[in-house]
Amino acid sequence: MNNIRNFAIIAHIDHGKSTLADRLIEECNGLEAREMINQILDSMDIERERGITIKAQTVKLNYTANDGNQYCLNLMDTPGHVDFSYEVSRSLAACEGSLLVVDSSQGVEAQTLANVYKAIDNNHEIIVVLNKVDLPAADPEKVKLQVEEVIGIDASESVLISAKTGLGIKDVLEAIVAKLPAPQGDVNAPLQAILVDSWYDTYLGVVILVRVKNGVLKKGMRIVMMSNNATYQIDNIGIFTPKKVMTGELSAGEVGFITASMKEVADCKVGDTITEEKRPCSEALPGFKEVHPVVFCSIFPHKTDDFKYLREALEKLHLNDASFTFEAETSNALGYGFRCGFLGMLHLEVIQERLEREFDLDLTATAPSVIYRVTTRSGEVLNIHNPSDMPDPTKIEIVEEPWITATIMVPDQYLGDILSLCEERRGEQEDLSYIGNTTTALLRYKLPLSEVVFDFYDRLKSISKGYASLDWEISSYLVSQIDKLSFLINGEPVDALACIVHKSRAEKRGREICARLKDLIPRQQYKIAIQAAVGGKIIARETINPYRKDVTAKLYGGDVTRRMKLLEKQKKGKKRLHSIGNVNIPQNAFIQALKISD
């Protein structure tokens, strides 16, 4: 056990985490040269294209150090995005040390900060690695100072590398062996293992990634999940090198995978403790919590026939990702679809993109919504994320909405614009400080989650030319003035456009969507009224004027009463059409109307 090192790589998006993992695998001959592809641990196409890591991955490497000893290095590649922060915290709980990778041309960013604090909470030994030192804009000395001032850890012995060219990779491996502690654990104690991640394999069923803290996992053993007391028999045990290699057992300190004929990923919750049925451990490992969706939206297929394919696609994705939820719903305007819950906006985008790309579906997504807590006059408390479930305003006592604490790091030339953005989004400033002697400001703001889930991140990036970074966590629910905004077309409500908004935003949003619908809905033979309403009150209106058909064109001369008679007949016909005619709203109009304006 003294020769085992378990470590994670912490980095902000794009600072070179997956590339460093590639170089470490190459250096330790984990794969032959012909099998190497860039970002080997990012197994989904979408992970490679967006340059993000979504699922936690692991790899076991054998390394012969300069002292002549053979070491077993277990590397955990963790997600870097705020939506997947719980996965990060569980991966970190399975390790004793971390490599903090910082881009030496960009410096420390907000998500790096959040993940480093998680590592410190897990008592990690941290090695600072400055990447991209071969870039002309690299300034390692300045970044070392920044790491010391912002994070408060010693960066004097930072390892300077370029993951792209392979410079300094050997130094990283030596630092891991020399500075990171070996795992603690007792092979003879009752089994205690942490569930780090799980995914679905077509042949093996659910594959579980585990780190054994105490005891030994053996093939054929009956195990218990401590969160729900479900029992299973282990079929296979192995490690990733990054290829699957069956080993038959894992003992204290080791990281590997097990399969146990599980049918669904939902049965194995990340962070759960696994123990033996015959000789269980006395208590579960700390830190486990259920992950709940934060952002909701409805997804509808363009073609009604695709509904069953959408259900199958969602079920397949759910096998690998139990953190998103879905349930069937119907809309008068868009037909059959699903109400889905996600961990955040990136999670929503990734799932939607995978549905469209991997399953070849054309989809419409409604405006994202968060969970509001509604207390009715009868004292009942409801959690509501779908506008159609909102009770009548006369029955509502109070509505509370989720607020977050956001940490924003931004160069000071963009500070004014970022402060304006936060104020515009109903933010309350908690703290503003400068990082050491740098020109980077550290902002702490309280913001309503509903204002952040739309396009806050995109606006933040565009205002700051990409230099600002954001990290957030939900802090509390606060009483707020929330309204349900409905849209009526010729007096008929259109459920797909309804949304839940803050009172101060209702009129502006109502006017925007009415104006957009006016441009998108084709003209008819009669007048069309587009209205936005809150409660029973109309707050915005647009009118689409009808075509004018010249019914008197065929007249030549003759009595004026003939002309009046034809116009009167046309008027009656239009009135009848208006009372029985349904306005045909093209699918495209919904998609365009639901796009959030700047």
From Swiss-Prot:
Record's keyword terms, sorted: Cell membrane, GTP-binding, Hydrolase, Membrane, Nucleotide-binding, Protein biosynthesis
Domain of life of the organism encoding this protein: Bacteria
Reaction(s) the record says it catalyses: GTP + H2O = GDP + phosphate + H(+)
Enzyme Commission number(s) from the entry: 3.6.5.n1
Subcellular compartments: Cell membrane
Cellular component, GO, one term: plasma membrane
InterPro entries, sorted: EF-4 (IPR006297), EFG_II (IPR041095), EFG_III/V (IPR035647), EFG_V-like (IPR000640), EFTu-like_2 (IPR004161), G_TR_CS (IPR031157), LepA_C_sf (IPR038363), LepA_CTD (IPR013842)
Function per UniProt: Required for accurate and efficient protein synthesis under certain stress conditions. May act as a fidelity factor of the translation reaction, by catalyzing a one-codon backward translocation of tRNAs on improperly translocated ribosomes. Back-translocation proceeds from a post-translocation (POST) complex to a pre-translocation (PRE) complex, thus giving elongation factor G a second chance to translocate the tRNAs correctly. Binds to ribosomes in a GTP-dependent manner.
Similarity comment text for this entry: Belongs to the TRAFAC class translation factor GTPase superfamily. Classic translation factor GTPase family. LepA subfamily.
NCBIfam families: lepA, small_GTP
Name recorded for this polypeptide: Elongation factor 4
